Amino acid sequence: MTASKQPKHLSKAMAKWAEQRGDLYAAACPSRGVLDHVTSRWGVLVLVALLERTHRFSELRRRVAGVSEKMLAQTLHALEEDGFVHREVYPVIPPRVDYSLTPLGREVAGHIEILTDWIEESLPRIISARAEHASRKPTPSGEEAKRELRVRSK
């Protein structure tokens, strides 16, 4: 993005990042905030639900079982702010608001859908691995291991 095309509301620090690839490993990189929004429990589910079709708020709330109104509103706001979700308000009574994905949102949701599909398909193997892990004798923590070594060496 060239300086002339940058939105005027960007700070100088953000403008710097608007012109280069993000670096998730850099503490100050705004990509970390985007990562938080996209990979949060509710962010993942909202993005994949909106990949299916446009939803109203109440439809999304039913589709994403377990999300509170407050968390859904915060999640939608963050995803809208990041440019992934489009919020369309219709001037009717009662008010109607539709949520859909932007082209950028469809792109990220497509990647996330691959992960969510893999999780659903792999769930039996994951549950089996958890059961196997739980059945093993726990390994001692750092301090416990040191005490165990001292006892053995005496």
Regions from the PLM with identified roles:
Residues 72, 76-82:
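Basic amphipathic alpha-helical segments that dock to polyanions
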Residues 80-100:
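Beta-hairpin "wing" of winged helix-turn-helix
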Residues 52, 93, 107:
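Glycine-/small-residue-rich active-site loops that bind phosphorylated ligands and cofactors
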Residues 68, 75, 102:
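Ser/Thr-centric signal marking residues that sit
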Residues 21-71, 98:
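N-terminal helix-turn-helix DNA-binding core of bacterial DNA-binding proteins
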Residues 61, 89, 112:
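Short, flexible helix/strand-to-coil boundary loops that buttress conserved ligand/catalytic motifs
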Residues 1-27, 81, 86, 103-154:
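C-terminal regulatory/oligomerization modules of transcriptional regulators
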